[in-house]
Amino acid sequence: MAHPHLLAERISRLSSSLEKGLYERSHAIRLCLLAALSGESVFLLGPPGIAKSLIARRLKFAFQNARAFEYLMTRFSTPEEVFGPLSIQALKDEGRYERLTSGYLPEAEIVFLDEIWKAGPAILNTLLTAINERQFRNGAHVEKIPMRLLVAASNELPEADSSLEALYDRMLIRLWLDKVQDKANFRSMLTSQQDENDNPVPDALQVTDEEYERWQKEIGEITLPDHVFELIFMLRQQLDKLPDAPYVSDRRWKKAIRLLQASAFFSGRSAVAPVDLILLKDCLWYDAQSLNLIQQQIDVLMTGHAWQQQGMLTRLGAIVQRHLQLQQQQSDKTALTVIRLGGIFSRRQQYQLPVNVTASTLTLLLQKPLKLHDMEVVHISFERNALEQWLSKGGEIRGKLNGIGFAQKLNLEVDSAQHLVVRDVSLQGSTLALPGSSAEGLPGEIKQQLEELESDWRKQHALFSEQQKCLFIPGDWLGRIEASLQDVSAQIRQAQQC
């Protein structure tokens, strides 16, 4: 076997060659190439004239001496037009029912069948055997067929509960294509002088028969780590809970795993990685509704669980709560004690803030959380001037709950110990306390836990950075995963600065 990274580079260059002159079809070419290299089938859905047949023709050039067969199905198509005509000579001389398969599907490595759902039962039944077993019964003999890639295309989906569902289930990769959207790409397509049928692939990049056969064995040796299986099982369970989720057969799951193994193999890895699971978005959908649903579920999996994002946020939440508990345990020591002013005959008792409280905005911790204005509150931010005026003159006082949003009206009072007490609607009170001195920093327990969490984040980010070098995964998906990891990092840093 070639060095894994050299193989990955070669497949990347091969794909780039195949993509030349095709606009906004990179993802389709790459997945069709992956399907061809792993012996799977592809269904292309889209309107006429968007290069579906050209994609299939291009894939022939990925292999040395590959033969191609393409056919446009109609309601009147016969098996002879797909699998070859009957040999009149054999029937006449020997009474043998035998087809002449040269130049037809049974002897082609790359097969493209357009308007696939218009095929009749006789063609469909033979095609199912060809896809499943890579065999063709020719008279009394069963012949092995060399098909590496079947690309089926249509501008419509098969009717539900029809005889076509069995064939549709064999199409592992399903791609929904549309016309060229980008203005610059549209202009380039219109003015291109390239002959679309020319071979764009250098000989050195083409796959030999020996390489193809060897790779099939090596793909099967790619391992499925436990943590990746757990992600797959999580996705399967989540889909089973959704009422509108498509039915995914055990056969489709098993074939999808081999595709993930191929993705890892041709990316230079020895094991399936979480990033490979993004390919499932093109394997598990059935129709337009399920396409969106599958993408949403895989997005949740990738941005919330694949690199432990949600787990790290849960741990962070527990650390923050513990930090608050430690702060609240110190609240009696740091309770804000205001200074009483005036004599005993004053009409209203007046107070002022201690001289060492100088910040323009005061953040005071609740000794115990209270529910204020439908929010669980652990600290309140006051404008110093507003609090001083209330201590001196009384009236209305407002503060920002948990330091966010608009300042809300509060039920605040000074108790007999000259501590500030805030009360909820049921008049339960909580003493307000100054946070610990900034010089004290984070408690050692909290600091250590945050450092351990940050270390785990770095490991997960390093894994993602290493795994994201995958030709078959669109860049926008990788961008969303990176953003989810950076969000976790930002929240960890924020907690470290508290």
UniProtKB/Swiss-Prot annotation:
Asked whether the UniProt record includes Nucleotide-binding among its keywords, one would answer yes
Name the residues that bind ADP.
23, 49-54, 196
Reaction catalysed by this enzyme: ATP + H2O = ADP + phosphate + H(+)
Q: What is its EC number?
A: 3.6.1.-
What CDD domains does the annotation carry? AAA (cd00009)
| Keywords, alphabetical | ATP-binding, Chaperone, Cytoplasm, Hydrolase, Nucleotide-binding
Enumerate the subcellular locations listed in this protein's record, separating them with semicolons.
Cytoplasm
> A cellular component term (GO) from this record?
cytoplasm
Task: Give the top-level enzyme category.
Answer: hydrolase
Activity regulation comment: ATPase activity is stimulated by ViaA.
Q: Which residues form a coiled coil?
A: none
For molecular function, the Gene Ontology terms on record are:
ATP binding; ATP hydrolysis activity
Q: Would you identify the family this protein belongs to, as annotated?
A: Belongs to the RavA family.
| Function (record text) | Component of the RavA-ViaA chaperone complex, which may act on the membrane to optimize the function of some of the respiratory chains. RavA functions as an ATPase.
User: What does the record note on quaternary structure?
Assistant: Homohexamer. Interacts with ViaA.
The record's listing under PANTHER family reads: ATPASE RAVA
Question: What is the protein name given in its UniProt record?
Answer: Regulatory ATPase RavA
Recorded source organism is Escherichia coli (strain ATCC 8739 / DSM 1576 / NBRC 3972 / NCIMB 8545 / WDCM 00012 / Crooks)
**Originating gene:** ravA
